[in-house]
Amino acid sequence: VRSTSICASSPGRRQMVRVITDIVLPYLAFEGLWTVTKLLVEGRADPNITKPSWTLWFLLALAIFRLVLPYLALLRWPLLWTLLISIGAGYLPNIDSTFSLSRTLGLLPFFTLGWWVHEHRLVERFALLRTRWWLTAASAVAFVVAGWAAWYFLDIWQAMELRQWLFYDDDYASIGQTGWWAGGVRLLLMLVALLLSIAFFSLVPREGHRWTHFGQYTMYVYLLHSFVL
């Protein structure tokens, strides 16, 4: 959500060039680094830019979203349409991880929501950055409840392969869910993710600190942390 809130609805030549310089080129560079890493560590290398390595899927997803954003902006209800696309994509077995397409379509509502909130200036209009004690308390309770549910119902989550649901990398049938209601599970998980995202942002301190400016370098952390792991 946050990574797409700064996207413009009608990118021109400058914005399109930034897609290449800020996303595509780093993706290709780090794919090359991953190829070398695999060769040194595992003794083999299978370079394939259509299959992003580990965390690099996000760069491809972000690039694709910025390319299709002008068309999404033309729709009357972009959030509704992307939600239908996300749910519907899970029923199609031919949509896989090639060019990170399965995750791009699956997470498309979150990308669109980030742009939509920024485009309609909802943060400023509703003073969403203002700290409210009841919202802070409710957010803390939400995380406590989520943590308790994650631990107490662990056997259930493992049985339903919740981990695979959260990856958005496989269609419903590949996870073992062939029922018509599988799309409802994805919808429910997205709603839970949205609520926890709101809770998280409500707990983030509003005032600046000496380390606040480090936030602008999170892309470097994102790209490099996977090598450490």
Q: Which role does the model predict for each range below?
A:
Residues 1-229:
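Alpha-helical transmembrane segments and their immediate juxtamembrane cytosolic regions
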